[in-house]
Amino acid sequence: MITTIVISIALILVIIGSLISALAAIGILRLDDVYARAHAAGKAATLGAMLLISGVFLFFIGREGYVNMQLIVGILFILITGPLASHLIIKSAYNLNTPASKRTKHDEIKKDLKNTKL
């Protein structure tokens, strides 16, 4: 009984993670500039991958009955590197003066850079 519940939760996590990853891919294709695309890749793809791996982790607990530590390390690795990579992509694009889309109203980074002493 508990095995069926755990596997059902794992299946739901895998499906939700797949849908979020698909939405991230659509966002990367449809959004206007590099800043919005990196935001879609950094947020949605990270969450989607974490849900997928969490679902696989629960599946192994429910089906095989053991805890796979490599999946926990993978979840932590994605949790750390996903947002960091998107931040560095956006920062390098800003430093290269990559133009934003016409829908961008104001630039908050410019005000922050004036107050920063580098």
Swiss-Prot record:
Q: Mostly located where? A: membrane
Might you report a single GO cellular component term? plasma membrane
Q: Which UniProt keywords apply?
A: Antiport, Cell membrane, Hydrogen ion transport, Ion transport, Membrane, Sodium, Sodium transport, Transmembrane, Transmembrane helix, Transport
Show the stretches that span the lipid bilayer: 9-29, 41-61, 70-90
Question: What topology does the record note for this protein and the membrane?
Answer: Multi-pass membrane protein
* Family to which this protein belongs: Belongs to the CPA3 antiporters (TC 2.A.63) subunit G family.
Q: Spell out the NCBIfam families in the cross-references.
A: CPA3_mnhG_phaG, PRK12587.1, PRK12674.1-2
UniProt-recorded name of the protein:
Na(+)/H(+) antiporter subunit G1
Taxonomically, what lineage is the organism? Bacteria, Bacillati, Bacillota, Bacilli, Bacillales
Gene name of this polypeptide: mnhG1
